[in-house]
Amino acid sequence: MPEILFREALKRGLQEALENDPRVFMMGEDIGEYGGAYAVTDGFLEKFGPERIKDTPISEQAFVGAGIGAAAAGLRPIVEFMSISFSLVAFDQIVNMAANLRYMSGGQINVPMVIRAPTGAGVQLGATHSQSFETWLAEVPGIKVVCPSNPYDALGLIRSAIKDDNPVIVAEPALLYGDKGNVPDEYYEIELGKADVSRSGTDLSLIHI
């Protein structure tokens, strides 16, 4: 199997979605001309144009709200935070709107939106850019949260997240963007909500974060 970087796996999944589904578009801070805080969207603006790769103001509340509206109207937005730390600014939109619309409408309105968010510390960006709120968000009914740990999982999970008809948060550990791993050329997805059993046995370790 070819070996690729974590960021390249994400980029492949995003590019596939943009190429194959005209309803998919992206928006976030510096994802266009700058190519994203971690270079995941580098080259996308030139390839797909400003109608589908939208640089936004520094207002997570505004562009998450815009993403929810676009998703409810039938599009499939992919919203990018520079850091999951800034999800706090958009908690009202995420928790009270994105997570609830399907239930409040009796299933008449879906919110097929992906929120991508670098998470964690270790990249010298200071305390305000180094939080890990994925466990908070995972407690919200109506929100799915995935956190890939290698390029194989990153590609399989981003593919499934984009196809899901409900909001999915992809928490991407910032320390892993430069990590390499084996990823097959053949198409695959990783089912959301299904545990990955890496090794079977009789002993269980419980790790609390």
Annotate each language-model stretch with its function.
Residues M1-A171:
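Thiamine diphosphate
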